[in-house]
Design a protein with these regions (language model features):
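Single conserved hydrophobic/aromatic residue that forms the stacking wall/gate
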Residues: 1-7, 11
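Short, surface-exposed acidic-centric catalytic microdomains
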Residues: 15-72
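Classical nucleotidyltransferase
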Residues: 44-46, 58-153, 157
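The conserved Walker
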Residues: 160
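Conserved lysine of the Walker
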Residues: 164
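Conserved substrate/cofactor phosphate-moiety recognition/catalytic segment
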Residues: 169, 173-216
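Glycine-rich phosphate-binding loop used to anchor ATP phosphates in small-molecule kinases
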Residues: 206-257, 272
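A glycine- and Lys/Arg-enriched "phosphate-lid" helix/loop adjacent to the NTP-binding pocket
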Residues: 243-312
Length: 330
């Protein structure tokens, strides 16, 4: 239970001020094991999403460009933050921090009482530096809204009957994570009565959009890595094969969705008719495989060929490639 003063503290506004400095942040990223650098809007979004149901919490971004790096530059920083808070109408009477060394500095430069929160890191025994150095090792400490940013994506490509769907399912199981199924199959069933005979040019943007939504869902709930059954280059290749031209919306998604690892399965496994496949001859399979390679290269997409002709060897090779990407030791 809270006494009167504590109850007042519980309902008063809280202000989270996120500092950023392009030069400093770039250096931190380059010294990290992160695959991409978060932008200022990325970081703001994480905070806004995390605290969106706590209406008394306000999120701000404070530009620290040109200020001496921590722990120096207190005079310049404190003058800057005073001006910033005045502009935002922030009148704090408490500062919360986990850094013991900062408490006297806040009092000296800002004249504000400081409340230490878990200064010994007994509850949250992690630092930002540790996460930057090895995000996957400290995965459980990364906030839910932030995890998708660190997720690695693996796209499995190949022609018809190359074993993509089964392989993606097995990989997701072995890595205990999510996968994005090929949306085109669901679309054919839900919109075309289960038969591609009615497929036309105007369907490809809808197929691509649905697949993008599947991918986004898989990434959002992934455990470090998400597996994608078929990419947008494959969708574009089918469009070019059947309609004689490429689709600009599909191309836009090719440009937007870049995967960390693209695996191209060789078309050297037995072809199995399932009612939705029509490129079963050796000539058709070879032509489509060549088209995939051509379009991958045109779009400057690096890929790894998996040429093993039996499913078990193919699976083990893919596991090896994913582990290498994740930085795991054999």
């Amino acid at each position: 239970l809270c006494d009167r003063r504590q109850r007042q503290l519980c309902i008063r506004d809280r202000h989270i001020i996120m500092g950023f400095d392009d030069t400093r942040d770039r250096a931190l990223f380059e010294d990290s094991a992160m695959s991409q650098q978060p932008t200022v809007p990325d970081r703001l979004r994480w905070l806004l999403q995390t605290f969106k149901y706590q209406k008394n919490i306000r999120i701000h971004a404070f530009n620290e460009e040109g200020m001496e790096p921590y722990p120096h530059g207190w005079d310049v920083w404190s003058n800057g933050i005073k001006k910033f808070m005045a502009e935002k109408g922030i009148q704090p009477d408490l500062i919360y921090t986990s850094e013991e060394a900062d408490a006297p500095q806040y009092m000296e430069h800002l004249g504000i009482e400081t409340v230490l929160v878990d200064p010994k890191r007994t509850f949250m025994s992690i630092s930002g530096a540790q996460i930057r150095e090895n995000p996957f090792r400290y995965w459980e400490y990364i906030p839910t809204e932030v995890k998708p940013f660190f997720v690695r994506t693996v796209a499995i490509l190949g022609g018809e009957s190359s074993g993509k769907s089964t392989l993606v399912n097995k990989l997701a199981n072995i890595f205990n994570t999510t996968s994005a199924w090929e949306y085109g199959r669901d679309y054919v069933f839900s919109h075309l009565g289960g038969d591609e005979i009615a497929l036309q040019y105007s369907d490809y943007d809808k197929i691509a959009l649905g697949h993008a939504q599947y991918i986004d869902f898989a990434v959002k709930y992934a455990n470090k890595v998400a597996f994608i059954d078929t990419d947008f280059v494959t969708t574009q290749a089918f469009c070019k094969k059947y309609e004689g031209r490429e689709h600009p919306f599909v191309q836009a998604l090719i440009d937007e969705y870049r995967f960390d690892l693209v695996i191209l399965l060789e078309n050297n496994t037995p072809w199995v008719a399932d009612g939705l496949r029509s490129l079963g001859s050796s000539v058709d399979r070879k032509e489509f495989q060549n088209l995939l390679v051509e379009m991958l290269e045109e779009n400057n997409i690096e890929f790894v060929r998996v040429e093993e002709d039996d499913y078990d060897s193919r699976f083990l090779r893919c596991v090896e490639l994913v582990r290498e990407m994740m930085g795991e030791q054999r």
